[in-house]
């Protein structure tokens, strides 16, 4: 039994809680620095030549589950451990402290009052009147008072004692919500062209929701850099009701039936071109990260040089489209919707560049618990600021003295500044 109590004491200790918080904060920082949720090959390729911190390569990142920190077993273990520690601490320390704070403490000897942090002695002629005036003054100032014929016990701000347990309770809710989201949450990221749609299928095979991209627009700064992405989406849930149309943008997601739909990214997915008298051709574009973060392109056959190819690259929907020989020499540039240029002996025209919107769809059943936990933690933190004050007054008939004293769990100097007012009331009797 002693071993069990030692284990419980250790689990609920402040040192362990601080250590766990440190490791959780460190893990969260790692999850910020290392991209989360990418393909395994991306980690292996990106960290092959340049390991993270000079030590951790892609294989080690995958082995340590650093590619999905917040749903990794060790991170969930830390959250569970902290939650258990908080529950044990609340049960063994916070709850008994709260119960003790709710009990009235009755001092019936002057020596007890003299030992308090703040204490005074006042000579009074009419003890009954002094006790009554002090009682009325405390009541009017919001104190909870218990009075007897020759003594008073009063307290104020007891609600502040509920703060620490509420903070613990809120943090436990937060961790339960975070764990539930990590275990049961799902996310889907999809690039859609205007007119295209995505069907979200429930586990039982029933089509729950259809999301269709009606329009996509990129707002750019004068220097051509993207400033904002706007997607007009249409949602239908299979019912007979009219589809719902909404607009989403970066930092302005859409919440619908427990899902959160984000405007996450953008891309160039295709290009419409015409070669000579050919019909309009739609060619797919692929990202070329070797040439830059936002560069897309396609390889075209070089009709003038058998076995060789021409590289078309483009970085925005407004162009220009750049053409390079296989040796890397620039051939020409064509603006979408602009003039034709001769390439491979053919008049070549770039008619239009097709954009696609990066839609991120998240389902996180733990979000309500996280919000509730945050609200409880915030309320508990605010309540904890309230200082709990206690005051006692005792009249001794044999020497005609009224002893008055008090204590406070915080802001004792502020409480001491209130004492002259109480003494003035007593002396006026």
Swiss-Prot record:
One Pfam family per UniProt? ResB
- Record's bilayer topology term: Multi-pass membrane protein
Biological process (GO), any one: cytochrome complex assembly
Places the protein is found:
Cellular thylakoid membrane
List keywords of the entry alphabetically: Cytochrome c-type biogenesis, Membrane, Thylakoid, Transmembrane, Transmembrane helix
Q: Report one GO cellular component.
A: plasma membrane-derived thylakoid membrane
Q: Where are the transmembrane segments?
A: 14-34, 72-92, 162-182
Its main subcellular localisation, reduced to a broad class, is: membrane
Show the InterPro entries listed in the entry: Cyt_c_bgen_Ccs1/CcsB/ResB (IPR023494), ResB-like_domain (IPR007816)
Complex formation: May interact with CcsA.
Family of this protein: Belongs to the Ccs1/CcsB family.
* Function summary: Required during biogenesis of c-type cytochromes (cytochrome c6 and cytochrome f) at the step of heme attachment.
Q: What is this protein called?
A: Cytochrome c biogenesis protein CcsB
């Amino acid at each position: 039994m002693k071993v069990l109590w030692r284990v419980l004491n250790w689990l609920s200790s402040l040192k362990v809680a601080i250590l766990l918080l440190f490791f959780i904060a460190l893990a969260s920082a790692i999850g910020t620095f290392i991209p989360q949720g990418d393909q395994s090959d991306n980690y292996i390729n990106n960290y092959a030549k340049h390991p993270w911190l000079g030590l951790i390569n892609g294989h080690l990142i995958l082995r340590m589950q650093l590619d999905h920190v917040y749903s990794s077993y060790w991170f969930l273990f830390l959250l569970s451990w902290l939650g258990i520690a908080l529950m044990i601490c609340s049960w063994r320390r916070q709850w008994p402290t709260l119960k003790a704070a709710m009990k009235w403490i009755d001092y019936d000897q002057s020596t007890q009052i003299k030992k308090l942090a703040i204490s005074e002695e006042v000579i009074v002629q009419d003890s009954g009147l002094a006790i009554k005036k002090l009682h009325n003054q405390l009541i009017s100032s919001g104190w909870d008072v218990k009075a007897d014929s020759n003594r008073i016990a009063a307290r104020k701000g007891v609600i502040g004692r509920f703060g620490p347990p509420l903070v613990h309770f809120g943090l436990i809710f937060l961790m339960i919500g975070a764990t539930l989201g990590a275990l049961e949450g799902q996310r889907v990221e999809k690039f859609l062209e205007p007119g295209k749609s995505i069907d979200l299928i429930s586990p039982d095979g029933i089509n729950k929701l259809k999301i269709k991209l009606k329009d996509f627009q990129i707002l750019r700064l004068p220097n051509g850099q993207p400033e904002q992405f706007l997607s007009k989406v249409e949602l239908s849930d299979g019912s007979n009701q009219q589809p719902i149309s909404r607009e989403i943008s970066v930092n302005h997601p859409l919440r619908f039936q427990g899902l959160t739909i984000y405007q996450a990214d953008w891309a160039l997915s295709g290009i419409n071109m015409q070669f000579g008298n050919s019909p309009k051709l739609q060619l797919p574009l692929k990202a070329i990260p070797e040439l830059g973060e936002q560069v897309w392109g396609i390889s075209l056959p070089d009709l003038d040089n058998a076995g060789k190819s021409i590289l078309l690259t483009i970085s925005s929907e407004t162009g220009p489209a750049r053409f390079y020989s296989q040796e890397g020499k620039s051939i020409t540039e064509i603006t979408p919707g602009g003039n034709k240029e001769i390439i491979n002996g053919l008049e070549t025209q770039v008619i239009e560049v097709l954009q696609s919107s990066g839609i991120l769809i998240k389902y996180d059943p733990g979000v309500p618990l996280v919000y509730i936990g945050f609200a409880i933690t915030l309320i508990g933190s605010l309540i904890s600021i309230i200082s709990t004050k206690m005051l006692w007054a005792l009249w001794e008939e044999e020497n005609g003295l009224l002893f008055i004293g008090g204590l406070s769990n915080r802001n004792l100097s502020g409480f001491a500044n209130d004492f002259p007012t109480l003494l003035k009331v007593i002396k006026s009797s």
